[in-house]
Amino acid sequence: MEHVDSDFAPIRRSKKVVDSDKIVKAISDDLEQKNFTVLRKLNLVPIKKSVSSPKVCKPSPVKERVDHVFYQKFKSMALQELGTNYLSISYVPSLSKFLSKNLRSMKNCIVFFDKVEHIHQYAGIDRAVSETLSLVDINVVIIEMNDYLMKEGIQSSKSKECIESMGQASYSGQLDFEASEKPSNHTSDLMMMVMRKINNDESIDHIVYFKFEQLDKLSTSTIIEPSKLTEFINVLSVLEKSNNIAFKVLIYSNNVSISSLLSTSLKKKLNTKYTVFEMPILTCAQEQEYLKKMIKFTFDSGSKLLQSYNSLVTCQLNNKESNLAIFFEFLKVFPHPFTYLFNAYTEIIVQSRTFDELLDKIRNRLTIKNYPHSAYNFKKNQRLPLKLTRKVHDR
């Protein structure tokens, strides 16, 4: 209750206190007789906090209960925008233009994404690539290269997982090699099977998308099997001469040795030109700005709920003693600030059953103790859960 001076001086100084039972009875009679005399009087009379108080109380606005279904919609849209903001790679120069033009064309290309410092950068680019290729009308085949190029190799049980396809159902069915042909122990054999099947149908254009990622700085180039790399280059050489197949080789790397090895080998043996995108190194101030944008939503600018939410977040960030501001201060020195904030904030939104509970958790519950970073796995070479990445064939 907010206390204000009243213009009703005689009432303010009155020592008489009305019995609450009499008020209830008077209102009941008033409603029964439908003349509303008492209710009109009550609306005009200021109410004192106590008999001796020199001030009267001004009632606070009554909080409207947020409809459960309406809040669930708000919650769903908030989670969706949080995920989109987390995976945003808008700060990578010329990337959108490259994806929309070069990657969608049938022209062969080799692309290096270097200095990928954070998991969210890898996932963001990967999703952008998937979205771009999902708009291509021709058939797209995805081949994961990590298991193939590593020394350990792959087992026959994994052969089926190495290739995904988006496009015509008849072609997708042919990719189940374990059911139709002898299982392969090597991805190179598996790739050549794909090439033979594709070449048998020259009426269809295809893009074969090879993906390799190594985000661990500490790994050395010796993890790449030289013979496998030679085999892979031979496959690409065959594809260079094909009329109805284009290949896209995308390499996500935070390892100078691996980037150098692959770059030198591919450049020496192939005619295809390659493109290098270096991830910009954000300053601490830029990083904080992106983190703040990540939790400020814009999905419905006219929504009172959204206005209340954004107002609270802004106030909390501006108050250096608030839990949210302290949490952000910790993110300045944490190696994976985007992923940590995303994980903790996702939990807060998911766990909140009401809008008031969401605001309360942001004010009072968002702490390192309540959402410890030890609960999350931040290994740089670990890929994000499938729910955070869109596969090409998911429309």
UniProtKB/Swiss-Prot annotation:
Parts forming coiled coils: none
GO BP term, pick one: telomere maintenance via telomerase
GO cellular component: chromosome, telomeric region; shelterin complex
Misc: Present with 589 molecules/cell in log phase SD medium.
Compartments reported by the entry: Nucleus; Chromosome, Telomere
Gene Ontology MF term list: telomeric DNA binding
Biological source species: Saccharomyces cerevisiae (strain ATCC 204508 / S288c) (Baker's yeast)
InterPro entries: RIF2_ASCE (IPR049044), RIF2_lid (IPR049045)
Main location: nucleus
Protein name: Protein RIF2
Protein purpose: Involved in transcriptional silencing and telomere length regulation. Its role in telomere length regulation results from either a block in elongation or promoting degradation of the telomere ends. Loss of RIF1 function results in derepression of an HMR silencer, whose ARS consensus element has been deleted, and in the elongation of telomeres. RAP1 may target the binding of RIF1 to silencers and telomeres.
Self-association state and partner proteins as the record states: Interacts with RIF1 and RAP1 C-terminus.
Keywords: Chromosome, Nucleus, Telomere
